[in-house]
Amino acid sequence: MSTQSVVETVTALVKPILDDHHFYLTDVEFVKEGGGWYLRVYIDKTGGITLDECVMVSEALSEKLDAMDPDPIPQQYFLEVSSPGAERPLKHETDYEQAVGDYIHVSLFKKLDGKKVFEGTLKELLPDQLTLTVKDKSRKFDQVIDRQLIASARLAIEF
């Protein structure tokens, strides 16, 4: 089974578990690292997810995966269920919507105004662009970024 098929299968299995508890899925990864396979499921809820809640979801998902025949993941793997963390990636539209007003890090495919990386407060989100309020030494300014230029974005911790 391809990694994308595993992600799709796991997403379909975990969503009802999360919905029952008013949690939401932020990401699913199935990756090979250092000779081992890892199935990572990132979950959250308003106010933040707890370790006990991650354990509960892990056990429920593991039970569902074990009950499937044929096994959707024939190779051995480690199942990890966790919070996406303080610097969580912004991958979906809802991630960006929830990040309005938050400090974020944006990496671009190509330079914009001589830079490929911007950090600032997400001020405005439009379908084709976003606006960051950026601090540059002693001044603040709004930087408009075309969303097609964005290679990756994540929440960031402001220092």
UniProtKB/Swiss-Prot annotation:
Stated name of the protein: Ribosome maturation factor RimP
Function as written in the Swiss-Prot or TrEMBL entry: Required for maturation of 30S ribosomal subunits.
Signal peptide positions on this chain: none
NCBIfam families, A to Z: PRK00092.1-2
Cited Gene3D superfamilies: Ribosome maturation factor RimP, C-terminal domain, RimP-like superfamily, N-terminal
PANTHER family: RIBOSOME MATURATION FACTOR RIMP (PTHR33867:SF1)
KW Metal-binding (keyword) present: no
Location(s) in or outside the cell: Cytoplasm
Cellular component per GO, a single term: cytosol
GO biological process: ribosomal small subunit assembly; translation
Designated gene of the protein: rimP
Family that this chain belongs to: Belongs to the RimP family.
Keywords noted in UniProt: Cytoplasm, Ribosome biogenesis
